[in-house]
Amino acid sequence: MRLALVQYAPAGNAPEANAARILQLYREAAEQGAALAVFPELALTDADAGALLRRRDYRERCAAAVRELAAASGDCGLVFGAPLEDGEGRIYNCLLFAAGGELLHCHQQLLLPFDAAGRDRRFFSPGSELS
């Protein structure tokens, strides 16, 4: 199995631009024979999305970009990180797996690291189960 471990610098907190770049790099990996392309944590937004996550319109833009990436996935699996909201207003730092045009799995980060700013704990809820 050939894996593509993709590092790239997100275009700030622009989910649409980041989704376009992820899709471009994903397609390049698939063309080069990768069976799975793996992108970083919060690849869709950048790790410093912070206060933007409190805005519903921003969360909706992120969700739309996730749906777009899932729909564009093919035989090569696509793994990437993005913030997603549940139906009760909680936001999770998620690891997503898509293939064949579908979002097949979403894992919510269980353990939120603590940094001096308390960043992860201010903006994300911890997941409740290993999945």
Provide a role label for each language-model segment.
Residues 1-131:
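Enzyme catalytic cores with a strong preference for nitrogen-chemistry domains
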